[in-house]
């Protein structure tokens, strides 16, 4: 018999193990999305379309397709790709210029609160009111992540949740099921951990600062509570409109302590380099067969989903974050949206909007996937038969978006999010190194985060 599924999620018949929980086959056949066609009139720009993006598979596909886009737009494209930290710095320094040196910028979803509050992004509601974008086709939480206090500031170009990737073949060989809960995950990691075979039980982000800060926030969300005291709405939390006391950190809560203890227990089944491991290293360890499981952003799934030499090729189950006693299955969303800088020359806005709309269209996002990306923020692209044949992960994420598993409240886009992540990731790293107790690390994180939010006048 099939293993039991996570609560509240239907099992859909099919092959391929647990991935079937989220497989998109039940949504009916969709038509095939055609390739992009040239714009009716070429973009009316005096010079090249200037784009600032992140160095990842989606934007690398955009770069590979540069000549094709130049043909579609009828103009040259000048593109610059930076690592995540350099990208944020460049966006901030560009905002200080009288006139933006970029027409379109790619923004990490949690940055939208900070960038919108500082007036760095041009709201696009007036452009959307023309009615030529089907907002209902986007994953709801990706669209909400690119909004700030009711104003839409960008359109998603990729949705890349962090999931638990599990080697189904190793679980089968060990006679165990794949994990759904936090306690399951510890047991599975223990069972599959084998130093003699050069394999760790699990790889995850435990590098100091930003990487570990993300892990803590996401796991605490799966324990059933965000790290800020966000207002509750039905079964979820308000990550858009919360103010005052609802922005107070809750790092002295039961869920925060449970998260810290869980991460400390994971150390025993983790790679020796775990305390310097971040996004790429953990995905690489999993892809190379050095870890039986990994918390992994789907953005990096091509390392094993499209690589036939990987031991994980074709034998990976993509699961939501394992949940704690008070939690439920969640997939914390990440990704990027394209936005227009507020200091762009006004006479460029019309043409740039045409380009941004085209670069986030179903036709173009399908093109990214055909050129090495495995992420889409659009339901229509996930349902395309050509796309579904490439990898099950695309349909799995689509199913999570439809069933409410995809969430952005574990890492809410508040203006201070970058600093808060850094604070938590620094204090918890001290704890994992043995320099502080769990209670001391959480007290220090609470005090520092609380001082930051007070200094910004939230309460």
Regions found by a protein language model. Give the residues of each.
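Extracytoplasmic/periplasmic substrate-recognition and gating elements
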Residues: 170-174, 243, 267-271, 296, ...
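Periplasmic solute-binding protein
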Residues: 109-120, 125, 141-178, 206-244, ...
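Hinge/lid segment of periplasmic solute-binding proteins
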Residues: 24-41, 109-162, 315-319, 388-390, ...
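Extracytoplasmic "Venus flytrap"/periplasmic binding protein-like
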Residues: 68-138, 147, 169-180, 285, ...
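Glycine-centered hinge/linker elements that transmit conformational signals in sensory
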Residues: 189, 230-276
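Conserved N-terminal structural module of periplasmic/extracytoplasmic solute-binding proteins
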Residues: 1-114, 132-133, 178, 347, ...
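Long, aromatic- and glycine/proline-rich binding clefts that accommodate carbohydrate-like moieties
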Residues: 35, 313-321, 370-426, 430, ...
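A structural signal for short loop-to-beta-strand junctions that line the ligand-binding cleft
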Residues: 93, 100-103, 131-170, 200, ...
């Amino acid at each position: 018999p099939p293993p039991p599924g996570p609560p509240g999620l239907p099992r859909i018949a099919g092959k391929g193990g647990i991935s079937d929980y989220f497989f998109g086959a039940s949504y009916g056949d969709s038509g095939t999305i055609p390739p992009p066609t040239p714009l009716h009139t070429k973009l009316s720009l005096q010079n090249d379309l200037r784009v600032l993006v992140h160095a990842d598979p989606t934007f690398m596909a955009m770069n590979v397709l540069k000549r094709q886009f130049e043909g579609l737009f009828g103009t040259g494209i000048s593109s610059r790709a930076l690592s995540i930290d350099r990208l944020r710095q460049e966006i901030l320094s560009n905002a200080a210029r009288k006139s933006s040196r970029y027409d379109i910028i790619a923004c990490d979803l949690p940055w939208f609160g900070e960038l919108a509050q500082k007036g760095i992004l041009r709201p696009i509601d007036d452009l959307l009111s023309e009615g030529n974008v089907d907002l209902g086709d986007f994953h709801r939480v990706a669209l909400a992540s690119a909004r700030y206090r009711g104003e839409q500031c960008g359109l998603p170009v990729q949705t890349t949740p962090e999931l638990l990737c599990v080697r189904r073949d190793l679980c089968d060989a060990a006679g165990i099921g794949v994990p759904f809960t936090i306690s399951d995950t510890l047991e599975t990691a223990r069972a599959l951990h084998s130093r003699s075979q050069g394999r760790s039980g699990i790889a995850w982000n435990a590098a100091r600062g930003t990487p570990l800060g993300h892990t803590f926030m996401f796991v605490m969300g799966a324990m059933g509570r965000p790290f800020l005291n966000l207002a509750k709405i039905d079964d979820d939390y308000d990550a858009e409109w919360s103010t005052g006391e609802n922005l107070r950190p809750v790092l002295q809560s039961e869920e925060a302590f449970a998260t810290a203890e869980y991460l400390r227990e994971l150390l025993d089944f983790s790679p020796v380099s775990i305390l310097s491991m971040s996004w790429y290293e953990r995905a690489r360890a999993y892809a190379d067969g050095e870890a039986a499981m990994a918390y992994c952003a789907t953005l990096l799934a091509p390392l094993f989903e499209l690589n036939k030499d990987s031991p994980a090729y074709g034998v990976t189950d993509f699961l939501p974050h394992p949940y704690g006693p008070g939690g439920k299955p969640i997939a914390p969303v990440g990704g990027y949206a394209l936005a227009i800088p507020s200091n762009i020359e006004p006479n460029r806005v019309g043409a740039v909007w045409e380009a941004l709309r085209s670069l986030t269209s179903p036709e173009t996002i399908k093109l990214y996937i055909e050129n090495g990306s495995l992420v889409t923020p659009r339901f229509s692209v996930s349902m395309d038969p050509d796309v579904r044949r490439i990898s099950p992960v695309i349909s799995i994420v689509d199913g999570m978006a439809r069933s409410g598993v995809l969430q952005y409240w574990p890492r809410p886009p508040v203006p201070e999010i970058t600093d808060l992540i850094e604070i938590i990731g620094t204090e918890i790293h001290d704890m994992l190194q043995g320099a502080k107790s769990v209670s001391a690390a959480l007290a220090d994180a609470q005090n520092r985060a609380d001082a930051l939010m007070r200094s910004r006048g939230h309460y």
